Amino acid sequence: MDAPKEWEGDNVRRTTSASLLRWWRATPVRLGVAAVLLVAAIGAAPAHAARRLSDGQQEAVTAMARLDADFYDSQEGLYKVRGGAHEPEAALWPTSQVLAAAIAVAKITHAPADLARVRRIIASLSHFVTPEGVYHARVIRSLRYYDDNNWVGLDLLDAAALLHDSSLLAPAKRIFSFLISGWDAKQGGGVFWADGHPDRPTVSTAPGITLGVRLSALDPSGSYREWPARFYAWMNSRMRGPQGLYWDHIQYDGQIDKDLVSYNQGVMIDANVAYAVRTGQRAYIEQARRIAAATAIAFPGPWRNRGNYAAFDAIYFVSLAHLSALSPGATNLAPARDYVRWERATAAAPRLARLENELLEQAAFVQTAAAVGD
């Protein structure tokens, strides 16, 4: 479907504060535009009453504590890519996923220590910051990846809502401006992968839809209305295949890599969820449901991915949780819960202890367990 040509202000108001509160309480990670609307429109989210955590939530809390113990270097103030005394510092991509995991846990517990962890990780982003106020891929001067910056921008909006800290909105806005600067106007659109890299992947463009739509809830200026719509239209005209799923990237020579990867579907589910909340149009929920249903057909059987793919799957599963929270029954969370059970058993096995001792994989487990674990 097309992006909206104008915002439906009355429809936004019809998305009641009660429904947004239900979504806030039910959705532990990457909260979508509803989190921003809650803080901006109806005040701070209420403190959570003491309650028993689900098994998945408790596993997420425990796994996050273990992640800190295994990977955090308190002297450097950074996480290491693997557990061990002489491992290198993690790059921005895994660090962004650790921040998303920390936000997920703090959203569950609201414990002072968990909120402090979120603040600490945000402060550590200063190691990656560029003179322009966006982020290098590594702690040394390196390329600026548009997709990595997308994840950080979404994390910052989630943290702004969670911590009631409006100072985090400015760097998120700078990231969105950076995305616009990466738009390839000469070759028909799409955001580049990185500085000087001509590939245009789905994950450089699609998360920018959600980022821009969420920012529009706070600042309805033209760029936050025009550019998400442009990104959305490009994704659906250039990157959507006949199955209704989204291909991976356009190469430097204009050829399309038609690989199907889980998180490319997840970011477009989230984009439609964001538009559904922002506009009140049911058609976006239906589009998100179609993507989820097509993904279930294209990715049959157990999900058993590792490394980067575990993080890709986490992004997809979290998007399903967002869709389910906004529209109960809209999608089937059983495969995601089966995935958590499999990872739980894997982590307990001596041969594969601690999910292969990879920071990115641990962060992925925390996010998935927090979002869908039973």
Which sequence ranges carry the predicted segments?
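N-terminal secretory signal peptides that target proteins for export/translocation
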Residues: 1-25
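Bacterial N-terminal signal peptides
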Residues: 32-41
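Boundary at the C-terminal end of the N-terminal hydrophobic targeting segment
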Residues: 47-49
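CBM-like carbohydrate-recognition segments
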Residues: 51-101, 105-147, 151, 200, ...
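Short coil/turn linking the two alpha-helices of tandem helical-hairpin repeats
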Residues: 106, 160, 216-220, 276, ...
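Extended ligand-binding groove/face enriched in aromatic
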Residues: 115-218, 225-226
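Active-site cradle of extracellular carbohydrate-active enzymes
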Residues: 195, 205-208, 212-216, 223-272
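Oxyanion-binding "anion nests"
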Residues: 264-279, 284, 288, 294-296
